[in-house]
């Protein structure tokens, strides 16, 4: 089993779209039993997978009580892909972790869920607090979507510093340039500055995910966006195999 965190210190970089599409690739391309665990109280991952929230807010009960996390897992319409949706109850999850005094709570929960899943993908909130620290300890690989701008390297340095501060054995980091439009001079310059970073293009098919409530590969499998996510997932599997 491997756990992969999609993390950014700022919003608006396509983090949730990354999480949903990579989870779909894990289940569909690699045929892995995959769980997408939404840790962002906005609950975008469940929405994009067509899973409507339940009226009772209970996502935080996994962390505060001895509740079986599998009881909150929801099936999706995509074979091999389940989601553990978020809700407003985890908005104060950082304080909850601190009050519990359990710095490896997420690690233990992930280990428990790994009995039934080959890949666990975290959709993380854009925060620097105890939630992000718990994710750093639980993840085997960190995917960091970054906008194509001169500030990308600086944003990555912030994440690297946070990861290194999380303790020994921190996960490797894979930066990905997100929402790239090669017609724009600034985007081309950013791409030229970091030629080894994988790229996800700015594409209408990706924006359409919110309308279709499906991963792009499910409704536009031949689109450049679908190919880009498939290539990124292949790179992720390769990196995981290398350890």
Enumerate the predicted regions with their spans.
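P-loop NTP-binding core
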Residues: 1-243
């Amino acid at each position: 089993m491997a756990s992969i965190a999609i993390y950014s210190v700022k919003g608006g970089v396509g983090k949730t779209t990354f999480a949903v599409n990579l989870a779909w690739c894990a289940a569909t391309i690699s045929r892995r039993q995959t769980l997408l665990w939404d840790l962002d109280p906005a609950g975008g991952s469940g929405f994009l997978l067509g899973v409507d929230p339940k009226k009772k807010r209970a996502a935080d009960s996994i962390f505060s009580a001895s509740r079986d996390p599998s009881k909150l897992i929801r099936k999706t319409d995509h074979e091999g892909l389940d989601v553990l949706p978020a809700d407003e109850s985890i908005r104060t999850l950082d304080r909850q972790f601190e009050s519990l005094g359990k710095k490896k709570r997420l690690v233990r929960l992930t280990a428990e869920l790994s009995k039934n899943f080959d890949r666990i993908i975290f959709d993380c909130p854009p925060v620097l607090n105890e939630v992000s620290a718990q994710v750093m300890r639980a993840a085997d690989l960190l995917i960091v979507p970054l906008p194509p701008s001169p500030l990308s390297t600086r944003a990555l340095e912030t994440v690297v510093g946070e990861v290194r501060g999380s303790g020994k054995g921190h996960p490797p980091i894979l930066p990905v340039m997100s929402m790239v439009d090669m017609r724009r001079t600034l985007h081309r310059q950013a791409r030229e500055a970091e030629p080894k970073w994988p790229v996800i293009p700015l594409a209408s098919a990706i924006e359409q995910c919110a309308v279709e409530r499906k991963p792009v590969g499910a409704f536009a499998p031949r689109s450049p966006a679908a190919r880009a996510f498939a290539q990124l997932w292949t790179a992720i599997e390769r990196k995981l195999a290398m350890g």
